[in-house]
Design a protein with these regions (language model features):
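Non-catalytic regulatory/interaction regions at protein termini and inter-domain linkers
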Residues: 1-77, 89, 98-101
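Single conserved hydrophobic/aromatic residue that forms the stacking wall/gate
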Residues: 226-235
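PAS-family sensory domains
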Residues: 45-81, 141-146, 159, 165-227
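Sensory/regulatory domains in signal-transduction proteins
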Residues: 78-141, 195-196, 200-212, 217-227
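Hydrophobic beta-strand positions
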Residues: 42, 112-113, 179
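Conserved beta-strand and immediately adjacent loop positions that scaffold enzyme active sites
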Residues: 39, 109-110, 176
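PAS-family sensory modules
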Residues: 2-36, 129-176, 220-224
Length: 235
């Protein structure tokens, strides 16, 4: 069975930096899948020029479209035309054809993976159109945040240089997320994010406040609590 490293090995034109970038991408792309409520596929062309699924990412926030392992699968011939067009694009490329995966109607969007002036492959965002019906504020904010991260891929801005997944016990989208303005003001906080801050002792509302100031309030509250705790002499 083909795996990620073996598939990349079919491309001798990829240098170490190219491979490292792709490994970094699949280490960090879970957040995009979760925010977007969508499956992600990384496609690269193998030594024969065929588009192959090099890696896949299932969302943890919605039922996956891909219960089976599709790594190593060759993309069908009827998709080659739009895949070639997406590879030549400098921005996100949207398919004009709805496809069927299982029993779901799916819209494909392609993000060319750009790095050091080269297009290494495509990240396919497979969206089940049924998940776009009757979305509320939470879903809309989540999808928009995922879209912004996804659109950074062709610009070479995602993944970040410093890995997001390097920490142990990393929080996931389902634990809550916060949307900030360019100035660092909270524009939206997911319900679970608000609950986390409440448990830490935050009493004010979050939207409209600088996140840094909210954090400072919590630090001051913790410091005050420590100062007022009775001290026990060591025996």
């Amino acid at each position: 069975m083909a795996d990620f490293s073996h598939i990349l090995a079919t491309r001798p034109d990829f240098d170490d930096e190219d491979r490292e970038w792709l490994h970094h991408l699949v280490a960090d792309w879970q957040v995009i899948a979760d925010l977007s409520f969508a499956d992600l596929l990384l496609l690269v062309q193998n030594g024969d020029g065929k588009y192959v699924v090099a890696e896949q990412c299932r969302p943890s926030t919605v039922m996956t479209l891909r219960a089976e392992d599709v790594v190593g699968n060759v993309m069908p011939d009827d998709m080659v035309g739009e895949l070639d067009a997406a590879m030549l694009s400098s921005v996100v490329f949207r398919s004009t054809v709805l496809r069927t995966v299982g029993k779901a109607t799916v819209c494909n969007v392609y993000a060319p993976v750009r790095h050091n002036g080269k297009t290494l492959g495509l990240v396919v965002r497979e969206t089940n159109m049924a998940t776009r019906e009757s979305n509320g504020r939470y879903e809309s904010e989540s999808i928009n945040a995922g879209k912004q991260l996804y659109e950074m891929i062709p610009r070479g801005q995602f993944p970040y240089k410093d890995s997001m997944m390097s920490q142990r016990h990393i929080a996931r989208v389902a634990d809550g997320f916060i949307i900030l303005t360019m100035d660092g003001v909270v524009r939206y906080a997911a319900p679970n994010a608000i609950s986390c801050f409440r448990r830490l002792g935050l009493l004010t509302t979050m939207p409209g406040h600088y996140l840094s100031e909210l954090g400072t309030q919590l630090l001051k509250a913790v410091s005050y609590t420590h100062l007022t705790l009775p001290t026990t002499p060591y025996v």
